[in-house]
Regions:
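Pyridoxal 5′-phosphate
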Residues: 1-387
């Protein structure tokens, strides 16, 4: 899809080789888009890919499954490459990260102790609280710090630890996540990492981290839209059985045999469920190929420099933001009690941002120009002056 060699990214190279791949998303008249940490901007090729999958349906009807399943397997392989999974069969397509979490929670036959943090994304937090209220888990939450998690493990060993590697409100990277995983494994606990704000903007090697599970998706930084999510299952857990299953987890889904006990597919395919959505993996392919072609290391180098320039422009206007340093992920954030209202006012001024709680979140990416960031800085300053 893209071949720009190994050169460091710069605005001239991006204008020549990358922006033309996004002509639809960059059409004139659009707001300055600084919500790249939320819904990523898709490559033009997404339209062609989805149309091809639909054409197969119209043309081939039931035989379209061959093409759809090939696209699904391509999605799994590309995601494995992105996150450092040992093979594509360790990546289980899901429609949401929450669906992946439920599959892991439903591994356990009896109520279990779950350790998490007070900084998880709303869906993860909500699911854990519902499982707690249903008597399915005992839930302990601590601050999102490695020391707090490890201390809590020593106080009462959990069966499952659920923690983000990058926090969704502030973009802060949770330092010492390797120590958390090691301590959990030593205590006999499984670990599920939420890497949604990590994959695609920071180098990631799940195999090296040795986490049991991880959840993420293509909605944000890999530009694949909603529904193209996944659960990573470490190979040592391929033989474990969750209640979240279905006929695609059988050893021969289209054989229609019913052995008793059920026979599961080999490897990670045993974690599949029932009939999957077919367009979500298709719509994610172009963005995954694009991200892998550039590489997380090169993207991170560019984004760090870009964040620092953006933060400096805001600082020149008297605005203090968090997130510019290497201890943060992809976006800047500005603490303000009326962050949601500020985001709405910025949209009226032609700058698309978002807010989570008291945080106004601002995320440039390689499609944003320095001129756009200068204009956005002026708009943010104007909105705050008015406030």
């Amino acid at each position: 899809m893209i071949d720009i060699g190994a050169a460091a990214l710069n605005e001239a190279l991006i204008a020549q080789s990358i922006r033309p791949l996004f002509s639809r998303a960059l059409a004139s008249g659009r707001p300055i888009y600084l919500a790249n940490h939320s819904l990523g901007r898709p490559p033009d090729r997404v339209v062609e890919d989805v149309q091809r999958a639909l054409d197969a349906w119209y043309r081939d009807m039931g035989e379209a499954w061959d093409e759809w399943l090939a696209a699904r397997d391509r999605f799994r392989a590309l995601t494995a490459q992105l996150v450092g999974a040992p093979s594509g069969d360790s990546v289980i397509p899901k429609t949401s990260a929450g669906q992946g979490l439920r599959a892991v929670l439903n591994l356990f036959d009896a109520p279990i102790r779950v350790l998490s943090t007070d900084s998880e994304f709303d869906s993860i937090d909500f699911i854990l609280r519902v499982y707690r209220d249903k008597g399915r888990i005992e839930l302990t939450t601590v601050p999102a710090r490695a020391e707090a998690l490890i201390d809590a493990m020593h106080a009462g060993p959990p069966q499952l630890v659920v923690v983000s590697t990058v926090l969704f409100r502030s973009g802060e990277i949770v330092a010492g996540i390797e120590d958390v995983v090691r301590s959990a494994r030593a205590a006999g606990a499984s670990v599920l990492l939420d890497v949604y704000h990590h994959a695609g903007v920071l180098p990631l090697d799940l195999a090296a981290l040795d986490a049991d599970f991880a959840v993420g998706g293509s909605y944000k930084y890999t530009r694949g839209g909603p529904g193209a999510c996944w659960l990573y299952v470490h190979p040592r857990n391929h033989s474990r059985r969750t209640l979240d299953t279905g006929w695609f987890a059988k050893d021969d889904p289209f054989g229609y045999e019913r052995p008793d006990p059920p026979r599961f597919a080999p490897g990670g395919d045993a974690w599949m469920e029932s009939t999957p959505p077919v367009l979500a993996p298709v719509q994610a392919l172009a963005g995954l190929e694009f991200t892998n072609a550039i590489g997380a290391v090169r993207l991170r180098e560019y984004h760090l420099a870009q964040k620092e320039r953006f933060a400096a422009q805001l600082a020149q206007r008297g605005l203090r933001v968090e997130g510019a340093g290497p201890q943060f992920g992809a976006f800047l954030s500005l603490a303000h009690p009326e962050a949601t209202r500020l985001s709405a006012e910025l949209m009226r001024r032609g700058v698309k941002t978002d807010a989570r709680g008291d945080r106004l979140r601002l995320c440039a990416d390689l499609l944003n120009t320095d001129d756009e960031l200068a204009a956005a800085s002026q708009a943010v300053a104007g909105v705050l002056d008015k406030a």
